[in-house]
């Protein structure tokens, strides 16, 4: 789970700015459901969400004891997860938004923020979505980046 969690954190953290006027946006929102873990990072202009499924290729990745949400400081969470000794990770949120992260013999305590304070994302209708292969998207960006303004 650590590797999947770290990948998700790396993706979501790309949207987080250390210079923000909204303090909760220095954190990553973790939403756990029976389907999996959704990680959300935002700077109020750009938001990145990534999803880790509970099961992949018939293999259990995440065990969900109880669904819930919390916002944890992104940089601190990333450093902790990156340095965890084993791939097994347990994240427990207790009363008062106290969060305990365990892996092997290591245990870390963080104070989280209420996920309800995190800005809501606008809902996007399914008919406005499309898929594009990543290599094609990279090519399109590479061939058009010269036209991007370097100043606002």
Which residues make up each language-model segment?
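Structural preference for solvent-exposed beta-strand-turn elements
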Residues: 1-152
């Amino acid at each position: 789970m650590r590797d999947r969690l770290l990948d998700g954190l790396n993706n979501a953290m790309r949207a987080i700015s250390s210079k923000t006027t909204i303090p909760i946006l220095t954190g990553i929102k973790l939403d756990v459901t029976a389907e999996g873990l959704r990680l959300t990072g935002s700077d109020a202009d750009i938001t990145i969400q990534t999803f880790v499924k509970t099961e992949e290729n018939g293999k259990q990745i995440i065990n969900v004891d109880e669904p819930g949400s919390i916002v944890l400081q992104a940089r601190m969470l990333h450093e902790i997860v990156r340095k965890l000794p084993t791939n097994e990770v347990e994240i427990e949120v207790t009363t008062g938004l106290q969060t305990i992260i365990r892996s092997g013999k290591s245990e870390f305590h963080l104070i989280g923020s209420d996920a309800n304070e995190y800005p809501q994302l606008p809902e996007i209708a399914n008919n406005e979505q499309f898929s594009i292969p990543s290599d094609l998207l990279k090519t399109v960006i590479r061939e058009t980046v010269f036209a991007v303004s370097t100043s606002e």
